[in-house]
Amino acid sequence: MLISVLKSKISYATITQKELFYIGSITIDEAIMERAQLTINEQVQIVNLNNGERLETYVIPGKRNSNIIALNGPAARKGEIGDQLFILSYALIDPTQEKLDPVLVDLKLND
């Protein structure tokens, strides 16, 4: 049996940009993506700490070291510039065969 477990978590990502008329996704600074071990087009869950909104989308890389966190397309309606987010990704594992320690990136601490 496979179970879904936390693979990566980016804490306290701040929305820096919104692009409503875009095809969708969340843009994340490529350096932050690498630290969190997220891949291009990987599915993520977004939790907005300011308003409680939750959504699922996929990741696209932003300019390295720009600190960009952009909600794109319909997701842009789920937050405002300056809102703080948790960005979560999950993996399916067989708990009898393996254990997964999640990668935690805390941007509030400048991890």
From Swiss-Prot:
Post-translational modification: Is synthesized initially as an inactive proenzyme, which is activated by self-cleavage at a specific serine bond to produce a beta-subunit with a hydroxyl group at its C-terminus and an alpha-subunit with a pyruvoyl group at its N-terminus.
Cofactor: pyruvate
Pfam families in the record: Asp_decarbox (PF02261)
Gene3D superfamilies assigned to the protein according to its UniProt record, in alphabetical order: 2.40.40.20
Entry EC number(s): 4.1.1.11
Annotated compartments: Cytoplasm
Cellular component terms per the entry's GO annotation: cytosol
GO biological process assignments: alanine biosynthetic process; pantothenate biosynthetic process
Reaction(s) catalysed by this chain's protein: L-aspartate + H(+) = beta-alanine + CO2
GO molecular function, one term: aspartate 1-decarboxylase activity
HAMAP family: PanD
Subunit and interaction comment: Heterooctamer of four alpha and four beta subunits.
Protein name: Aspartate 1-decarboxylase
